[in-house]
A protein has these predicted regions:
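PRPP-associated nucleotide enzymes
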Residues: 1-195
Length: 195
């Protein structure tokens, strides 16, 4: 549900007006990132990492692209995904999650795993993933591109590594709100690539 507030934001060399979309914090100013911005954040993250990781766990959907880039940069071959569903209603902060996808314990036990997501906003999903890794006997650390400290539900916890601190709603270049419309494109209707 879109908020009623319109926020004016400077985007690159152009000005843009965006309706707010975060139901938990409807008055956040939005910041739209470019791929160059993401590269800079990852370049800032990588030197922070302490030691090597046995694997990397990307939280869907936000962690897929930064996790893929980081796994390539660090040459991590053991790449896993976790998908966690929380009800999206504002009053559901205490709801229990549903794990839509999670690696089996045999891939986690006695390993050091880097958890990757795009942003630590309220922290629920990341903390529940880290808790499940700990229950499997896995040591883990958390890396995010952005850390929104003020909105975190966890006063005594946060990511081990982050590219930047923000108080804005971040729009990443892979999010559908900044991609060209694809509603007219249908799978299987395009030409096949030449061989």
């Amino acid at each position: 549900m879109l908020g009623q507030t319109i926020i004016y934001t400077q985007v690159g060399d152009q000005s843009a007006v965006f309706p707010t979309e975060d139901p938990l914090e409807p008055n956040l100013e939005r910041e739209v990132l470019s791929w160059t911005d993401v590269d800079k954040l990852i370049d800032h993250l990588i030197p922070q990492f302490r030691g090597e990781f046995d694997g990397l766990l990307m939280i869907t959907k936000g962690g897929l692209i930064p996790g893929g880039i980081i796994s390539e940069a660090l040459n991590i071959k053991h790449v896993l995904t976790a998908s966690v569903y929380f009800p999206s209603q504002v009053d559901s902060k205490l709801a229990w999650p549903t794990f839509m996808q999670f690696p089996p314990d045999t891939l986690l036990t006695n390993r050091r795993i880097l958890i990757v997501n795009d942003i630590w906003a309220i922290g629920r999903v990341i903390m529940i993933v880290q808790g499940r890794l700990a229950a499997a006997g896995c040591e883990s650390e958390i890396a995010v591109l952005h850390y929104r400290i003020k909105s975190s539900l966890f006063a005594d916890a946060g990511p081990d590594y982050y590219g930047a601190v923000t108080d804005r709603q971040i729009i990443y270049p892979w999010e559908s709100s900044v991609l060209p419309p694809r509603s007219r494109l249908k799978p299987g209707t395009g030409p096949l690539p030449a061989i």
